[in-house]
Amino acid sequence: MNQRTIKTAIAVTGTGLHSGQPVDLEFHPQPINTGIIFERSDIAGSEPIPASAFLVQDTMMSSNLVFGGTRVGTVEHLLSAIAGLGVDNLLIRVSASEIPIMDGSAAPFVGLLLQAGFCEQEAAKRFIKIVRPVRVKVDDKWAELRPYDGFELNFEIDFDHPAINKDFQHAQLQFSTQNFIEQLSSARTFGFLRDIEALRQNNLALGGSMDNAIVIDDANILNEEGLRFNDEFVRHKILDALGDLYLIGYPILGRFNAYKSGHALNNMLVREILSDPSNFEIVTFDDNVSCPIEYLPLNRITVEG
């Protein structure tokens, strides 16, 4: 199985969640072994920012990368789409300090990347294989990665709220591109009305609305269309985790389990794994059949020499 990038450059304009201003976003193909990198198109001569867990300096409400004094925030939904589609090498140019929020899910990014198409590259795709269980814990919240032949994500939330059904606070995803697209990519972020009002008083979440989030008051979901899934809240937490985990630098072979985890704990887990080389191995596969993860069929990808 080989690395992949996109076939052609593509662009879109969205709204910044916190600024409320238009944000231009561009995706560009990259050579083998480049990885995922961000670049601020609004800052002349700004250095590229690698998608690395060690550059996460702020996890308040989202995962935010800072490198050389330059910031790119709210990267997790986009990284989730990139991970879900198995993209290894990509340049992301953004005209502001945050990735546009789009509809609050990863689905618009998935659509954009599919529109750009994919190219297989002449280098083996590298996976990080978890070989020892690693767990991080803060109070009653925890997250772990364990050895597993494939990639599975299990997540449990615990909200005591009448609008968040107790029967739908746990979810599991057996990762494949198809499962990601169908079961996870369209799950939206959510927020409580009281928190949004407080953020706006501090000039934050100015772009937040029911067009890009599930909004909940003290008793009800305020969006007229309701939920996309009965368990959309916990599905979105898995979506977030998938993006946060991709900051490890490779697709993962392992089982992710979490209870009430968030961006900070997800980042702590990745750093803990990378802190000890005996926790993992970097592996490759000779072909798609031997790889335990199913990505998009190669017949939908243009092979590039």
What are these regions (language model features)?
Residues M1-D88, R93-G305:
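C-terminal regulatory domains involved in ligand/effector binding and gene-expression control
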